[in-house]
Amino acid sequence: AWALTLGYMVFTLLNLGTLSFPTSVWTAQSGAAVRIDLGAEYDVAEIWTNGNIAEGSAVFTGDDGSTAEYTQKYATMFTWRTQTAAMHTRYITLQCTAGKVSLNEIAFFDAAGNRLPAVIAAGTTESAALLDEPNTVPDEPSYLNGMYFDEIYHARTAYEFLHTMSVYEWTHPPLGKILIMLGVVLFGMKPFGWRVVPALFGAAMLPVFFTLAKRLFRRRDLAFLAAALLALDTMHFTQTRIATVDVFILFFILLMVLFMTDYIQMDYMKEPLKKLFLPLGACGVSFGLGVASKWTGLYAGAGLAAMFFAHMIRAGISCRKDTAARREFWRRTWATVGFCCVFFLAIPALIYYLSYIPFFRYEATKPNGVGSIALVLQQQESMYHYHHDLTATHTCQSAWYEWPFTSRSVWFYFRSLGEKRVSSISSTGSPAVWWVSAVGAILLAVEALFRRTKKESAHWKQAGYILLIAIAANYLPWTLVPRCTFQYHFFTTFPFVVLAAILFLQHMEESGEVSGRVKWIWLSVAAAYFVLMYPAASGLPMPRLYAQFLEYVLPCGQLFFGAV
């Protein structure tokens, strides 16, 4: 498992994002201007800008009277934008015309694509930031050197947390953005910096998943199969290489289920309470961290409660005819309930409250800032109404019943590289993993719930119930959500679907109904599919013809939505 984790970590960090990115900032209010000298008269055909956090507009004006308008909005920060110009000039004046404009760097190009020399001719001391990092100007704008998809919310907010600014993204609890911020602290506000922590959490999932699978299957080969299938899933790859919070909630959910499984597999009546409380306490802390990252942790929490109470009831039934055992059961139960009140209620509430420290710090800078408890309550109300009242639609939205069969990807990024090449990132599950797992999970449910044969061990049945509860808890609530939803909302469910399919495969293999080679054939097909899909999952430039093959021939659903 560790070799797989190390190999995956190295692989996922490759081409994650650049460390060469402008960090000094020029900020101007309406009316402020700076004059730029190109050193000689040139024909300026293109202007590149890298924006910071601001909303406003500006105009580039050449000495020949020609202009190029620039508008800065929330979706245009921390990425390179190109705009055409038609200037024959030596001097260019950049003036903020409305609102506020904030730029990290600018560059000028002629029609042949040559970057033109430029220096500040007149302006404030701060205006030097516009041209002081020329080595950070890339050969071409791409996901490697700028934000894409929801990074404009989550990575931006990580920057705001770090600099005690007004917080833009408040529709999810803060912990995930705080974790993204740690990468920014270590590597700067650069694409690698805001993506590295999600990528490392994605790699760290593999040993957690391996350990959970080993607890459930009691076989290292099947545990390795589970971890390898997770590593080879295209959605896992894309979701853990982008600076959003989904990777964190899945990581903490896996920890929750792992620790609850450890607890359930211990003898409730024989093990010392201190030993029982170790995995139970770790589960509660993981639950708190999960909910502080995303509210969907509450769905998983409902599953934990179902597992916990089923285990307690089973233990109570086993000792109902023995007076002494029954007395001991209630002693343990009351102690456990008290422990759970601390670790599943008080500590998660404290973690959740403390995750709002960045909000508290910003409020403290205001003359009439909101108090901490009032602020947290206010944020919860705002979050609820945002998700409950959301009526927006999206090209990539899909219904919950479509997710297991990957019919509609979530299109993160696309750039046309001339007539023959494109670069794209589509977040979608691998049919080689998801389709097979969905069928296997259904067969497991039938076997566990309806057939009830005596061939399976008590441990196998227990593992089946754990997985079916985990699937139901993380998936079924989405059937009641009226707002538009996306395939990546299945991200917290599909690992348990994979485990359920492997558990059914174990049953078939150990009963002699299928060969032991089947699992390796499955893994080989998943690996081959990952190789085929890698360009569309990673942004690696590919021939347009190959993109058309992926879109129209390979059974992977909509990837590019007709763009190729």
Write out the residue ranges for each language-model feature.
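Specific aromatic-rich, kink-prone transmembrane helix
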Residues: V208, F248-L273, V285-F287, A305, ...
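Transmembrane-helix signature of polytopic, membrane-embedded enzymes
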Residues: A204, F209-L232, L250-F251, M269-K275
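Short acidic/glycine- and proline-prone juxtamembrane loop motifs at membrane-interface regions
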Residues: W194, P198, M235-F248, S293-T296
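Transmembrane-helix motifs of polytopic, lipid-linked glycan transferases
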Residues: F192, V196-F217, L255-F259
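Transmembrane helical bundles and short interhelical boundary loops of multi-pass, membrane-embedded
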Residues: A1, V10-I36, A128, S142, ...
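Short helix- or helix-capping micro-motifs
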Residues: A226-A231, T238, L258, F287, ...
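Aromatic-rich transmembrane-lumenal/periplasmic boundary elements in polytopic membrane proteins
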Residues: G113-A158, F329, P348-T406, R544-A547, ...
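Short hydrophobic/aromatic helix or loop-helix immediately within or flanking a transmembrane segment
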Residues: I152-L162, S166-M189, L200, P358, ...
